[in-house]
């Protein structure tokens, strides 16, 4: 008898859960649309050489050219390391092989410092655009953020992922701008 009562209770609970209204659909009727855009993660094809002083703090950049399944673990082997320790600069310039429309996803492996670390991202349709500063009169200041952000700074979480950007690009430059830090 006790088992029958328990079964009846479970069935009543299941019916109550199944019968609940979708509050998002009800509250957004007539002012929402389904997104049919698909998402695809693309691995860069090659590294573009940068002057030596800009890459002094870069170890194992080839790891960025390998497919990544998106799963970070505390033992993720063979990662790229960017370090600004001892006053070094840490920059990489990636070539995706063809112009894409979208943004980038950054994944950070485990590290000693658990705070979010700042990186500067520059998206460009050419190497010179990805290397240039936005606006100004400097010789390397030929790009703009007018139609979409292509030069921005963001924080990369500890043992986590972040996605940003919405632009047309083929090349992506990533600079670790956090002083005295290491990003894996």
What are these regions (language model features)?
Residues 1-5:
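Positively charged n-region of N-terminal signal peptides that target proteins for export
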Residues 6-7, 17:
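Cleavable N-terminal signal peptides
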Residues 20-184:
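Extracellular/oxidizing-compartment recognition motifs
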């Amino acid at each position: 008898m006790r088992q029958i009562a328990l079964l009846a209770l479970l069935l009543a609970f299941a019916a109550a859960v199944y019968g609940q209204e979708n509050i998002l659909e009800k509250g957004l009727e007539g002012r929402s649309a389904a997104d049919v855009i698909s998402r695809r993660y693309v691995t860069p094809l090659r590294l573009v050489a940068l002057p030596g002083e800009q890459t002094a703090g870069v170890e194992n950049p080839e790891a960025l050219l390998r497919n990544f399944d998106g799963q970070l673990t505390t033992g993720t082997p063979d990662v790229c390391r960017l370090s600004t320790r001892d006053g070094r600069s840490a920059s990489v310039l990636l070539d995706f092989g063809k112009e894409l429309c979208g943004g980038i996803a950054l994944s950070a492996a485990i590290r000693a410092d658990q705070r979010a670390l700042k990186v500067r991202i520059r998206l460009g349709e050419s190497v010179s655009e990805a290397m240039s500063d936005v606006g100004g009169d400097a010789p390397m200041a030929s790009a703009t953020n007018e139609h979409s952000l292509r030069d921005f700074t963001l924080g990369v979480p500890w043992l986590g992922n972040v996605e940003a950007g919405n632009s047309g690009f083929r090349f992506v430059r990533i600079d670790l701008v956090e002083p005295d830090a290491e990003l894996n």
